[in-house]
Amino acid sequence: MNYYLNQSQSFSKTITEYDIYTFAGISGDFNPIHVNREKAKDSIFSGQIAHGILVSSFISTVIGMYLPGPGTIYLKQTLNFRKPVYIGDTITASVSIKEIEENKKIAKLYTIVTNQNNLMVLDGEAVVKLP
């Protein structure tokens, strides 16, 4: 595949309670802010929120499946958590190519996740080895 600057791709998903509980089971992170409706209600978020790393995992979906795609190797990822993601939110993870080192087959990617209101919930940068 040919890659070029500003090439981009996205993936969308509506976050469910099942997603949060499944991620808690896999990760072992049962923080009440994620899994206890009553305790989360009294938090600064006023309700259950998705794990930040669960939200960021959809960046990996884009990188591994769409852009650059299968065969891509993650080398580095920075994440800035901007806003909480709630059950029922539809998030869109997007990746765009910002730099390409052709000779090393390395790309620097801008990564962002937005919610259904087009508000940024997470952003960062990834460095990958191209397939």
What is the predicted role of each segment?
Residues 1-8, 85-131:
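HotDog/MaoC-like acyl-thioester-processing domains
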Residues 1-72:
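Hot-dog-fold acyl-thioester-processing enzymes
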Residues 9-15, 79, 126-128:
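Generic detection of short hydrophobic beta-strand segments and adjacent strand-loop junctions
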Residues 37, 43, 48, 79, ...:
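Hydrophobic alpha-helical context, especially transmembrane and signal-peptide helices
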Residues 65-93:
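Mid-chain, well-packed structural core segment of small domains
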